[in-house]
Amino acid sequence: PYSLGYVSGTMKGIWNHIRSLDFLQSLPFVDGKRIGVIGHSLGGYNALFLAAFDERVKVIVTSCGFTSFVRYRGGDLTGWSHRGHMPRIATVYGKDPKRMPFEFSEVLAAIAPRALFINAPLHDDIFDVVGVGGCVAAALPVYALLGNGSGIVVHYPNCGHDFPPEVRQAAYRWLDATLR
């Protein structure tokens, strides 16, 4: 992606997802007003980033997809900064959570007031549940301000970095009900 001018693999992924939405909307059997996304881990934060960049996404499910940068692996942003994700986290911001130009609470707020389902396992060793809670708490006032104070649903299963079947089924039901 870098030879094509993208500053990160993440931005290239966002572009690919936006183009996928363009294609979906060109199909006669797709209702472009009822598009939802769902993703786990890398797919979980890709779902958030796509929704932040493209308002055609009406509902979002993110599973094990984010935490505050300070709570991500104890503040060690190495996992975020490798070449396949966002290398500028290392080269520009020195992998320092305090120097990051954004926080995931702001990504959630950018999605508001669209409906958001979060799977945040209690024992996720990558995306710390306390950091997830802090991001959600910071975004909720924006949801309330925009008229959807109950727009974020969070599930806290008793597991590690996983999207357990019962939470996945709850997400599918929620997507179906919310998009109707």
Regions found by a protein language model. Name each.
Residues 73-128:
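The feature captures the conserved acid-bearing segment of alpha/beta-hydrolase catalytic domains
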Residues 136-180:
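C-terminal catalytic histidine-bearing segment of alpha/beta-hydrolase fold enzymes
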Residues 123-133, 161-162:
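Acidic catalytic loop of the alpha/beta-hydrolase fold
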Residues 38, 63-64, 119, 157:
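Alpha/beta-hydrolase-fold catalytic nucleophile elbow
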Residues 46-89:
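Hydrolase active-site cap/lid region
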